[in-house]
């Protein structure tokens, strides 16, 4: 158990680019000097959350735009929909993940492997041992930083805190058990096992699944303005598993531009049609972003230049040729025609 005084953490809108509402430079931290050692890890974790959000939603109608990445729920730019839920969860997970990893790497003097269960029986034929990643440490420190952003007691704050916790649960729930065999001539009579962090991509994929299954919480208008209202909010969220994402509002129509909400719509977005490595979701992106939004798919030819036929020359240089290649790209463009297939439904991001 790590008991610490709360830290004040503020996320502010970038002065130079107001649309870039959340970047690692937006973290302004004050508090005990002891916390300063964690600041670079917190910033790196926040950055990993940004990158993972953009990866997971690259071919969705909502593609994790910068304006969506402001963690403060009172800045006027944020809704309480399922996309907001994902942003909170993935950012919380990113901070916890990075703190845990850096702890195991020995970056902090007061933290190392979690050996609290070493020597104990873990299951049939194996014992706890080795160097487990210290998720308890990462969880405690990240909670002090990320949850400090929520100072309100209304439904929005409760939603954000719930999704922060869901992000931390995702890190713990995707940890991998790694084992080493012991015995004569590799007989593996017994095994010593420890827990390791997965690739952060696995955490992101797990939370993307939770995003699709997010639960909408219906509360009475104005709940939270009284002690009874705050109690009702607490009871409602307490009844929902902290492994699930929750939201209060339906999502807007991401096909359309909405300047008030900072949404650009899908016109002009690139989509994918061909490629050996494309998954089903990527291959359907032109239909999802263009056709179902009432837009045509415009084919554009372009020439790319890249290094190729690289050779190592003794000693010590690598020389490459410049190869030109014609490629075809696809974009959503305005067209006077009805949507292809079934009409899109407002609020859907798929």
From Swiss-Prot:
Main location: secreted
Highest taxon listed in the record's lineage: Eukaryota
Modification(s) after translation: Palmitoleoylation is required for efficient binding to frizzled receptors. Depalmitoleoylation leads to Wnt signaling pathway inhibition. Proteolytic processing by TIKI1 and TIKI2 promotes oxidation and formation of large disulfide-bond oligomers, leading to inactivation of WNT8B.
GO biological process, one term: cell-cell signaling
Glycosylation sites: 102, 258
Any one Gene Ontology cellular component term annotated for this protein: extracellular region
Cysteine disulfide partners in this protein: 53-64, 103-111, 113-131, 179-193, 181-188, 255-293, 271-286, 290-332, 308-323, 310-320, 315-316
GO molecular-function term, one example from the UniProt record: signaling receptor binding
Signal peptide (residue range): 1-21
SMART domains xrefs: WNT1
Keywords: Developmental protein, Disulfide bond, Extracellular matrix, Glycoprotein, Lipoprotein, Secreted, Signal, Wnt signaling pathway
Keyword Signal: yes
The keyword Glycoprotein is annotated on this UniProt entry: yes
Covalently lipidated residues, kind O-palmitoleoyl serine: 185
Family the UniProt entry places it in: Belongs to the Wnt family.
Function according to Swiss-Prot or TrEMBL: Ligand for members of the frizzled family of seven transmembrane receptors. May play an important role in the development and differentiation of certain forebrain structures, notably the hippocampus.
Name of the molecule in the record: Protein Wnt-8b
Organism: Mus musculus (Mouse)
